Structure formats: structure tokens, C-alpha cells
Amino acid sequence: MDHSVHNKLVSFIWSIADDCLRDVYVRGKYRDVILPMVVLRRLDTLLEPSKEAVLEEVRFQQEEMNAVELDDEPLKAASGYVFYNISKWTLKTLHAAATNNQQILLQNFNEYLNGFSDNVKEIVGRFNLKSQIRHMAEKQVLLDVVEKFISPNINLTPQECEDASGNKLPALTNLGMGYVFEELIRKFNEENNEEAGEHFTPREVIELMTHLVFDPLKDQLPLTMTIYDPACGSGGMLTESQNFIEEKYPAVGASRDIHLYGKEINDETYAICKSDMMIKGNDPANIKIGSTLSTDEFSNMRFDFMLSNPPYGKSWASEQKNIKEGTEVIDPRFKVQLADYWGKVDAKGSDATPRSSDGQLLFLMEMVSKMKAPVNGTIGSRIASVHNGSSLFTGDAGGGESNIRRYLIENDMLEAIVQLPNNLFYNTGITTYIWLLNNNKPEHRQGKVQLIDASQLFRKLRKNLGNKNCEFAPEHIAEIMQTYLEFNEVERQLDANGDAIGLASKIFNNEDFGYFKVTVERPDRRKAQFSAERIEPLRFDKSLSEAMEYCYNEYQEKVYQAGFLAEHGKSITDWCEKNDISLNNKAKEKLLDTAFWVSARKLLDAAQTLMQVVGEAEFTDFNLFKDKVDAALKASSLKLSAPEKNAIINAVSWYDETAEKVVKKVVKLSADKLAELLELYSCEEADLPDFGYYPQGKKGEFVTYESSSDLRDTESVPLKQSIYQYFLDEVKPHVAEAWLNMESVKIGCEISFNKYFYRHKPLRKLEAVAQEIIDLEKQA
């Protein structure tokens, strides 16, 4: 393609905004007029040659066929495109008929827009073009804008023509028009940095992604292929992918059909994308409007290639109702089959949804659900998706994010991740990564993941574009691709100051990213003693303790008088508000309800009764104390529920490392059950205390102890290691009483570039720092 011609077109169109719109729109709004007008003019030029044929078809259907509604298909056939216009107008005839009367032009313009087929009318509506035209007519610039777009000095038609001076203007192909339109979008996005990152990925990042996706299959690219972007924005990923294939890997001796698919939620960017498809001759019906997460528009389709830069750090809370019912995932795209530590797979599937504040990994799972199975020698599917750092490590073992990473790695889909330089994007300076997925890895990559750190590979821009202050040069992309394609490990290089430079690459086994998360328990040791001070807080309900304590201190026993608290309700709620105690209506009602206070006092009365029976002696053996309480309850007429009994016991007991262990229960195991337990834990009977089973001296009899929640800890054990061996090496030497809670084990997965690529930079010697200070003082 001759980009010099295209760049001249871009410059001319860009100048229209400054010439005609400067005093009518603020600079950031120029795009609202220029982009839809470019689309309109291109469609207009495409339809001009078939105008009479379309009007004749309209006449035929209305007069000969007596059609009440026009039939789309013959009109499309008459126009030669998937769109048409049944009005008598073109932009040139609109201009010719208008003279200087803006109102006549506005009226005719609306008639012209209403004559388009529904697919173009949808674009007009999404662009809000009628409103812009009305505004320009009011400001007396509509005629000027139309005149600029039909100027003989630019050629937006698919035929060669001459300008006003007789110079030849080359034809503008669909591919060339796509380039012009994309370049305009890029320039507007760079001008409007506030919104740029929402739907615009820097050109060189897309170029790297297309190389990563298509280069490994350059000799296997099918003649018919599908490309999908679930967050397509203005369509840059899709059209750049198409351009890349057509320019770099054209089909030899055959034609190649590339079908582009996408979905976009923003009206304007959807209109831009759909326009771009129409301009380039792609099927605009393949671009859908709406939320990718809420509705699975392409549920029955599978795609060859997928590229995307989904929004990161953006909440999906408003879409949860379409994905989950309570805690249950109802959308199959976001469920995965994973085995637990014992090898059991939940038939319902495991949750693969991230925290509601960041939905980026949902877009990745949407693409994974659209991968083609590599059967009968087919290529399968390849995905390139841009994400921020939280996608690599956020989320605990067993959580949605971790499950997603684990699923991709266990199923050997993750081929590589490339870390990009900071400040490469227009609206964020954070670190970003390209995830490369492949469900048909070549043999030498199977079971492996390549991590490439290209964060130090960039050249500085002379002028910042929003947050963007650097870019990839062609040689940087070539270096990344060479490292990736050759599947090489590359050591990090340091400059003379010890700072990292260049590129680094490491290759890992899939298991290197997995870990077991296991809970380590320690026994609860408690002392207990009844006292008036300890049971006094039982007067107050835990959920309202602070407010109730204030009321009791202020009014004493009057709080139990019927209606008293209600009379003083305003002063009580005012105090709560002043002291930042938030009360909803239900809590307020409880707080001022005498019956609620009386009910709470019954627990205190029960504790006082037990104190009289058990006494106020201190117990260093909680087991003995509990037996005494149970005996007292049995001997008395007190009827306490389990929560009420526990509330009293917890109020008068506390952890003390010198006290006896609190027994949970005594377990009796038959020989068969004991053998099953030993097989389950892969240990000897003598090792059972390390799993919480302590022998009692009788064959098959073990005691288990209550664990202390305050002393409970968790350990992350690499997937390649034995949990028990890790416990023996790293935990037991320091905490002799600890045991493993094997029922708690969850499998997690995380990827840490910092851990793998960090190079320690030694501190400078004091002498060197001192000398530098002396030198600076001399200069001053």
C-alpha cells in the first residue's frame, strides 16, 4: 500500500476540523463529526454508481409489485453492497441543491439519512449524527463541511479520478480506506487522552500481538479463517490482524477469506467499528452491540484466532446477575473442571469468576470458551490478550482468579506471557502483559510456559501522548519474536550502573506455578473463671454492644422499663450518629425495644446462676471447667441453646499457653478405618499426631483437640513438594505442637515476574556516595 497517499488524505480530512469546526465544537468533540462524515462520504461514493439502479428497483417494487414494504435483498443486489440508500440524494446533490440555505440542506440531509438501509441507519443513530448535523446547521457550517468532503482535491472513491487541476488521484481501495479511517481514529484518540485507553491499543502493541499469534503458523494459515475480539472497541485489533495477514502472508495461487467478529458495549466505538467493517468490505453484521459478559452472542461459534485488550480494573458487579445466582455460577463460560487435592472433581464445576471489582479475566475465559478443538489435523485456536499485573497473581488458592490460571496451565493452554514496558499505553502507566494461549502447542512447548520480560525494551517518545512516553521500535518487536520463536532462555543484562537493560526470557514447567495452600493448626489452651466483671458484657447483644453499653451507663435499670427507651430515642440515635455508630432501621428498632433488652438480660441472669453453682475459682483445665458447667446446667432448670451456652463459656474463658489443651473429641478407629486414614495421609501410625490425631494408649483410640483460631496459620507449598515433608522441614522444628489440617488443602496458581526476573542491585559504597557529595559541593 502507498501510505503516502493515505497520509495526505488523513491530513486533508484532519484539516476540515480546524477549518470548519473550530468555533462550533471544543477540540475533543471534533471526532463526533469527522468520523461519521468520513464513513458517510465513503458509503456515498460506493453507492453513487448504482444510484439509478437502486431507485429503479424501488420504483419496480412500489409500482410493479405494489409492495407495502421494500424487499432488502433486491436492493442490496442493485447497490452491489450489503447496504443501500433509496433517497434521491447524494452528498453532491445535497450540496448542489442547498445554495446557502442551511435549513433546506438540513431537511434534505435528514431525508438522505432516512433513505439508508437499516444497518447504516443503526450506525447513524449510534454516532448521534442527526443531532450533529442539526447543530452544524444552526451554526451555519453544515454546508461548509459537506463542501469539504465532496472536494475534488480528495478521492474517497474506489475509482481513479482527477483533481481540480487535472492531477490524477489514485483510487482508494477498501484496504486503503480502512487504513485512513484507522489512522484518523488513532489521531483522535491520541488527542483525547482521557478516553484513549478505553478503546485504543497502541499500533505497535497490536503489531506485536499479530506477530505472536500468526507468525508461528505462517505456513499453516487456513484459506478461510475467523478472528474474534470480545471487547473490540473501534475494531483496531480486528482490522490490523486482517491487514497483517493480507500484507505479510497473502495466499499464493488462491484467495483467502478472513471473517472478523467482535462485540462492543459503547455506542460510539461500536459505530466506529461497524463503519470500519463496512468501509473495508467486511460483514458489519458480525459486529454486535452490548455486554460480552452478560450475553453470549457467539455461543455457537468457535474461532481460529482471538486478540483483545479487555478493560482491566473495571467492575462487573452490574452484570453479576447474568453470570451468578448467589454463589452458583450459571454461565457455563465461567465454570471449569478442576480436581481437588484428593483428585475429586465437582460435577457442578469450579467457579472461574474473579472478584467483582475487576472483570478482565472473564473476557479471557470468554475467548477460551470459543476455542476450536484441534481435531483431524486442524490448527486449534490461538489467543493474544492484554492484561495488567493483577491477572497474574491476584486471588487466593481456590478463588476464581487462581482457578482460571490453574485451568489454563493444567490444560496446557498457556504458551507464553510477555511483560510490556510501563507507560506504553495512552491512559495508564501501569505494567501490562500479553497472554498468549494455544490449545495445540507444538511438541517442544508442551508442558512448558515461556515468560519474556520486555519491560526494558523501548525507545522514548519525543513528546508524551497522555501517559504514553515510550514505544516499541521494529527491532524490539523482532527481538521479542526471535526469542519467542526460538524458545530461548535469555539472561538479564545489566548496564554499568547495575540497571537492567534489554530483554530476558525464562522457560518453566507448568507445575512451577502451582502451589498447595494448607492450614496449620495449633491446640487451643484455655483457662476459665466466672466473675461478675466477665459476665457483665452478656447484658448487651454483640451486634449492638457499644450503643447498648452507652444506654445502660446513661440510664441504668430504667432501660428495662416499658417505653422508656422509645421516649429517649432521639437523644440515643443522636449519640450514635455523633460517635459514628451506623444503625439501620432494624437495628434502631431493636435498640429501643424493651423486650429486646429483657431477652438479652436473661443470658446474664443464666450466667449469674451458673457462677453461683460452679464458683469463682480459676480453672487451668478447660475440659474440667466445661464438665462442671454441663453438670450445673443438668442439675438446674436452665434451658440454654448451644449458641447461648457458648456465649457464656467464651465470656469467662481465655487462651493461656500454660493451660491444658482443649479436647474436641475422642475418636475410635477400627483396623480398616485406621488403614484408610494412613493411606489417605500417606503416613505411618506414629505420624498421625502431625495430622491432628493423638494416640490415647488404647489400640485405635485417638484424641483430637480444638484449634486456636488466633494461632492458626497457612502455608503455601510448591506443587512439586510433599506437603508433609514441607511441614517436617519448615514448620515442626519451630512449632512442635502444630498439625496439618489436610481437609483445608486448596490448589492455587500464580505467576510472579518479579520473583523470576528480579536482579538485586547492590547498594553503592559509602565512600562513593561521600565523594559524590564532596564533588557536588565543589561545583556549587
Region locations from a protein language model:
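Conserved catalytic motifs of ABC-family nucleotide-binding domains
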Residues: 312-315, 319-357
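Non-catalytic, mostly N-terminal accessory regions of nucleic-acid modification and defense proteins
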Residues: 1-217, 286-297, 419-422, 446-453, ...
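Conserved S-adenosyl-L-methionine
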Residues: 199-308, 312-328, 388-390, 397-404, ...
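Short acidic (Asp/Glu) and glycine-rich catalytic loops that position anionic groups and cofactors
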Residues: 189, 253, 283-287, 340-346, ...
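Flexible, glycine-/basic-rich loop-and-beta segments that form/coincide
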Residues: 426-534
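Feature representing long, continuous alpha-helical segments
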Residues: 239, 271, 308-310, 361-365, ...
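Hydrophobic alpha-helix feature that most strongly marks membrane-spanning transmembrane helices
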Residues: 246, 278, 282, 311, ...
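Conserved Class I SAM-dependent methyltransferase catalytic core
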Residues: 29-42, 287, 343-437
